From Swiss-Prot:
The lineage of its organism: Bacteria, Pseudomonadati, Pseudomonadota, Gammaproteobacteria, Enterobacterales. Its EC number is 3.2.2.-. SUPFAM superfamilies: ADP-ribosylglycohydrolase. It comes from the Bacteria. It comes from Escherichia coli (strain K12). Belongs to the ADP-ribosylglycohydrolase family. Pfam families: ADP_ribosyl_GH. The keyword Cell membrane does not apply. The keyword Amino-acid biosynthesis does not apply. GO terms for molecular function: hydrolase activity. This is Uncharacterized protein YegU. Keywords: Hydrolase.
Length: 334
């Protein structure tokens, strides 16, 4: 069953990413005016300078970088090698011509340029607060058992370090990875979500590097909005206006957790709600829908959407899921 949930997390990541791609980085008002309502895969509009490179049902840098991380984990048989993760991401960026397209976030671009110049990951500052670590962390949530919080945070920090080392970026990645890992263990969403603010607080305060607002407090605000809102549209509007749906970890991670709650953990519903939110739709979609997929397993993903993702992206997620499940079991036995 854990392999099915791991597969669900990987497909959830790709589903949320590809569904949210056409509207990414557009204001909510423009998403509504241009699309009306997104409820299926669409090509990136030529007017969207972040999405114009992508065809219908293609995922973006979020899932591509998650697979760079997964490849590094498989190559090292479940061990975390930050320099290999960094090289994999750089190789993908060069293949995709990501430096010349409006695809890389500012923190990742600076870090990858330094890696390209031969700097070891350990020497990079990488104190940015954008969401590049959280957006790609799902394979790590599949690998790491959610037992000892401190060692979990350390592992996530190590895997994030090629591009992001700040307290906030690491805490955001920890929240997403912890939720996925607990889901793979079969925990209920209500138990998982109640634990996330304290996990976020612990992760953010472990090594303070910024003067950021509290991720734990923002998670609580986002969840309160969803629980008190009068319907889905009102909840989405309030999340967008109050919490924010931007590329910063402090906005996008609380938004993603709140959208899992709003979608009642249904991965297909979650991907649609994220795509219509406005802002960093593909990244919020990738994070939130990965959690939903981990909660319910791959069979909860709409078979038609899954088939389209497979056909367009030439996916072999089964190979990743089998290997990650094996390496997770080895870690659980220690």
């Amino acid at each position: 069953m854990k392999t099915e949930r791991i597969l669900g997390a990987l497909y959830g990541q790709a589903l949320g990413d590809a569904m949210g791609m056409p509207s990414e980085l557009w204001p909510r008002s423009r998403v509504k005016a241009h699309f009306g309502w997104i409820d299926r895969f669409l090509p990136g509009p030529k007017e969207n300078n972040a999405a114009c490179y992508f065809n219908r049902a293609e995922f973006t840098d979020d899932t591509s970088m998650a697979l760079c991380l997964a490849d590094a984990l498989l190559e090292r048989e479940g061990k975390i090698d930050p320099d290999l993760i960094g090289r994999n991401i750089l190789d993908w960026a060069l293949r995709f011509d990501a430096f010349n397209k409006n695809v890389l976030g500012p923190t990742s671009k600076i870090a990858l340029n330094a890696i390209r110049d031969g700097k070891p990951v350990a020497e990079l500052e990488n104190n940015g607060v954008t969401n590049g670590a959280a957006m790609r962390v799902s394979p790590l949530g599949c690998l790491l058992p959610a037992r000892d919080v401190d060692s979990f945070i350390d592992d996530v920090a190590l895997a994030s370090s090629p591009t992001h080392k700040s307290d906030l970026a690491v805490a955001g990645a920890v929240v997403i990875a912890w939720a996925i890992s607990r889901a793979i263990d079969g925990e209920s969403w209500s138990a998982i979500v109640d634990s996330l603010p304290s996990i976020a607080r612990h992760a953010q305060q472990k090594r303070i590097t910024t003067f950021s607002a509290s991720l734990a407090a923002r998670l609580e605000i986002a969840l309160k909005i969803v629980r008190n809102a009068d319907g889905t549209e009102s909840a989405s509007e309030q999340l967008y206006q109050v919490v924010g749906a931007g590329t910063s970890t402090i906005e996008s991670v609380p938004c993603a957790i709140a959208l899992v709650e709003l979608a009642q953990t249904d991965p297909n519903r979650c991907a649609v709600l994220c795509a219509n939110l406005g802002g960093d739709t593909d990244t919020i979609g990738a994070m939130a829908t990965a959690i939903c997929g981990a909660l319910h397993g791959v069979n909860a993903i709409d078979p038609a959407l899954k088939a389209e993702l497979d056909a367009v992206n030439q996916l072999d997620f089964n190979r990743y899921a089998t290997a990650l499940a094996k390496y997770r079991q080895q870690r659980e036995a220690v």
